[in-house]
Amino acid sequence: DSPEVNFGCSPPADDPAVSPSLLDRKKARYYHGGDLAGVIERLPYLKDLGVTALWLNPWYDNHNRLNQIETYENQPITDYHGYGATDFYGVEEHFGDLTALQRLVEAAHRLGLKVIQDQVANHTGPYHVWVKDPPTPSWYNGSQEKHLANVWQVWTLADPRATPQETKATLEGWFANILPDLNQNDEEVRRYLIQNTLWWVGATGLDGIRQDTWPYVPRDFWRDWMAAI
């Protein structure tokens, strides 16, 4: 497993006014601190450890209140993990802002370190504005009221004997039955996701991308995505 590192917060980032009361180290699945400024400060330490690249958790902006849809032990949680994006062009305020991110990449490069972005092309968070107002009728596979649940059967995508139902649920099912599944067969969705990746590369100078939940996305999308990059 990859080691997980949490580096301290500057005071303004502890509990941002736009998303209050989501940082509490005594509660599981809350923000526990750690921001981009803290990572910048510790870059020499990471360099001395022999680290060559930083793979950060997704820095997309996430829901600014407790998540009442995704729960833990029947209690609402925060989207501390970063995989429930509400703005694919925003930086989560608990971590910092775009300027801080650009400074991090620049500082890492000065030390010969690379920065990897964790992206999510498969789904959005359940609180994204698109869920209630999708840009196109086929933006998502299904709706919050009616959709398939993901059955995690990745093998079906390579097995000609797999049932169409299992294959469809694997590609179009909502992750954990709560994360709205983007329809990459919609040309506008495809264009948006590719342009978003190109924007992050250009805006930050990042060095690599890790795609979350990539097996649940049509392979022809990845063909176009990789060709564009």
Question: Where are the regions a protein language model picked out?
Answer:
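Substrate-binding/active-site clefts of carbohydrate-active enzymes
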Residues: 1-199, 203-204, 224-229
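Acidic-and-aromatic substrate-binding clefts and catalytic sites of carbohydrate-active enzymes
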Residues: 94-97, 214-220
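Short catalytic-loop micro-motif centered on adjacent basic/acidic residues
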Residues: 116, 208-214
